[in-house]
Structure formats: C-alpha cells, structure tokens
Amino acid sequence: AAEYFQTVLTCSEIGAGKDEPEIYLQAAQALGCKPEETLVFEDAFHAACTAREAGFPVIGVYDESNRRFIHQMQEQCICYCDQMEECIEFLNANGIYRE
C-alpha cells in the first residue's frame, strides 16, 4: 500500500467503523489536507457513502463481495475501477497523479 498511499489507517486503530466518518477525517488530518482535497479509495458501498457525505471525493474499487452495488458505487464515486491500474489512469488523465 505504501507504493500508492501516503497514509494508511485501519478502523481498529481509529476505534470506529466505516459507517462513521472518523477514519476519513483522521486520515485527512494526518495528511494535512481538507476532506475535499483527500481522495478516498473504497470497495464498500456503505463506506463510499460515508466518505462522500463527509465531503471526500471517492474512487470506487471493484470487490467481488460488493458486486451487487456496482451501479450505486458508480453513482456515488467520481470514478469506479475494476483494477488499480484503471484508477491510476483516471488520476493521470485528470492531472491528480503523475507516475
């Protein structure tokens, strides 16, 4: 994960699940960024909704266990990807990330 992300936090470290925005808010704080400046990568629909409602742009990542929520994820997220390479292509195309 360190190859792609500056900070990685877990729900157990924070003491709250992804149905609460605390993990996302603490991640933004750790990065020294505002929510609207912090990309959230999520594979769970409920978590994507939580992050979006807290003001974060969300990139949806496919996960087999959440397949039934693909259309909802596509509506909630600024981008929805089957693989990390697709996410990187989206970020490059939008000037958000450069390899």
What are these regions (language model features)?
Residues A1-E99:
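Asp-based, Mg2+/Mn2+-dependent phosphohydrolase catalytic module
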